[in-house]
Structure formats: C-alpha cells, structure tokens
Amino acid sequence: MISFIGGTGPEGKGLALRFALAGEPVVIGSRDLGRATDAALEVQRLAPKASVEGSLNPEAAERGDLVFITVPFSGHRDTLEGLREQLRGKIVVDTVVPIAFEERRFRALVVEEGSVAEQAQLVLPESRVV
C-alpha cells in the first residue's frame, strides 16, 4: 500500500493517480476526512480499476508500506511530528519543497537543517527518509 500524507493537493493527487494507474493500491490522507474521500473519488474516476481510499493522515501513515509526504513546507515539521509513531520503520518519500508564494512570486526558504529531507530524518529518526 502506498500512502500520501497531505494527498489532496495537486502533487499528492497526481502521484496517487500515477501509482493507481500502475496497479498499486493507494491511500490519500488529509487532516479532513471529507477532503480525503473527495480526492480518492476523483482519482478513482480517472483510474476505475484501481484501489483508492481516502483517510485521515494518521491512518494513511499507519497503512502505508511506502509513505509520500506532500504537504506545504509551512506544515512540514508539525505534520511529521504528529505522525512519528505511525511512520516508525517506514520508508518515507519526502517531496516537500521549501518555497513560499508571496505577491505572485515564489521565494525559496532556508531550511535550518540544510534540506527538507534532513529535517524529516531528524524528526523521524526511526524512519528511512528518501
């Protein structure tokens, strides 16, 4: 099972769709069950033979053998800290990009730990972050 934490945005749904089309069962997680369910139904419509479910982030993290993190950078650390137990021993693919969108422009953000992946590994010492 492949899970997407914060999977209701364009990146999470797009990745979930590609894996679903390839025959992988996926779970789309969100802080809001309704949004997760809606995103799963949207992916299911595009991949009708696929196994696609929506759930709250903790359940998605628990169920995934491979877990993608697709949240905005502003919520990255807090999201991971809240899922530390569920992500223990898991392979975590962190797709988060440290950028802000301000006044119609993107701005790169400095990550104190050096990179988003390094931050994730420090927050999730018992997970394998890639």
Model-based region annotation:
Residues 44-48, 109-111:
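Short, hinge-like loop/turn segments at secondary-structure boundaries
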